[in-house]
Amino acid sequence: MMRFLTSLVLGAALLAGAAQAQNQPLRITIDEGIIEPLPYAAPNFVPDSPAAAEYAAEIARVLAADLTGSGLFREIPSTAYISQVTSFDAPVQFADWKAINAQALITGAVSVSGNRLTVRFRLWDVFAGAELGSGLQFAGTTDGWRRMSHKVADAVYSRITGESGYFDSRVAFVSESGPKDQRRKRLAIMDYDGANVQYLTDSSSIVLAPRFSPTGDRVLYTSYQGGFPRIHILDVGQVQQRVLQSQDGTMSFAPRFSPDGQTVLFSLAQGGNTDLYAMNIASGQSTRLTSAPSIETAPSYAPDGSRIVFESDRSGTPQLYVMSAAGGEATRISFGQGRYGTPVWSPRGDLIAFTKQSKGRFHIGVMRADGSEERLLTASFLDEGPTWSPNGRVIMFTRETQGASGRAALYSVDISGRNLRPVRTPDGGSDPSWSPLQK
């Protein structure tokens, strides 16, 4: 695990351009409206030696990809630069950056000693002609240079939006390869942007629905090893797994951790009925939460652990319901035209994301916990299985193409419905689960 040394003293908020008064802070407010991306420049970081040169260029590249990929920032290409940054401590030529309308400037330096790498950076308010603080430093191994890029991007994002970033995070997903009728599915994990893919299982059995723990060190998933679906739990660091729930004559699936990581919600099918259960991981004891003749599945906790949202067909079609985490009476919250499923609570607690099937199309949507303010963010032949970014501002999901190949791929979209983007994976991908920010 890479160890980070951090020191940060940030000053006044980033200020707007020439047309804005210097005592008014610039802040990107993320809402449902149209956002004009903030123009910024991120020149290659300055290396202290030839050994650091490649890292310096790559760190700036990944940093820019993070910020621009969020849809909130617009990178000014290096071909437009008037000034070049050749020294970390050289005075900034603010007039040159103003001339190309760079409202923010990010400069940095990279040093390498053996397998140790140190990154320093500064965030500048170009139009105010001021440095925002005394600098930030991350240190780790050369193998962890991408994480340091994401850390810098998170710091910039947080400073300008006032909210935490999401770049230094990972995604567990199901890697899919082979023809549609002989699809091989493996559990995999990667950086949020598709880099550093690691396969955690082979393709000897089908795997489904991976779900990260609140600490990001464990993953729940469903495996058909042995012929029946069983819930497994895997330690990501050790790549060690064990069966968490196994009972003859039953099928268990759709697992989800509680916010404290001590309990697992899941669906259990037995005797022709499917209900929700909660298992204490330490003791292995399970408590039945529902007892209806309908199918209850896809449960998800509220961030405070007090309530559960889930999918049920008790009304005749799949709809969304909310109930106490201890079970009891459930309240229906979905009333639009169509079928609803795969609900998941935002880490902010304000929204629930879901899959909706209506009029021959599939959608990813969001609504309030009481079912109000429903909004559909996407529409396609098949969109399903949303998962939230750590800051609750972006949703990743599975999109499957129509046709004989039926290739599944991962996409992301922000909660305003803007910035729909594919997430690159080596093969097809489905069932994403976003981790919390890494420590």
From Swiss-Prot:
Identify the Gene3D superfamilies for this entry: TolB, C-terminal domain, TolB, N-terminal domain
Q: Where is the signal peptide?
A: 1-21
Tell me where in or outside the cell this protein is found: Periplasm
Q: Name one GO cellular component term.
A: periplasmic space
In which broad location class does this protein mainly occur, judging by the first location in its UniProt entry? periplasm
Which domain of life does this protein belong to?
Bacteria
Which terms does the UniProt entry file under GO BP? Answer: cell division; protein import
Keywords, sorted A to Z:
Cell cycle, Cell division, Periplasm, Signal
Q: Which InterPro entries match?
A: 6-blade_b-propeller_TolB-like, PD40, Tol-Pal_TolB, TolB_N
Specify one Pfam family: TolB_N
Q: Which residue ranges does the record annotate as region Disordered?
A: 420-439
Quaternary structure and partners: The Tol-Pal system is composed of five core proteins: the inner membrane proteins TolA, TolQ and TolR, the periplasmic protein TolB and the outer membrane protein Pal. They form a network linking the inner and outer membranes and the peptidoglycan layer.
The cross-references to NCBIfam families, in alphabetical order and at most eight, read: propeller_TolB
Q: Which protein family is it in?
A: Belongs to the TolB family.
Q: What does this protein do?
A: Part of the Tol-Pal system, which plays a role in outer membrane invagination during cell division and is important for maintaining outer membrane integrity.
The name this protein carries in UniProt is Tol-Pal system protein TolB
What's the source species' lineage? Bacteria, Pseudomonadati, Pseudomonadota, Alphaproteobacteria, Rhodobacterales
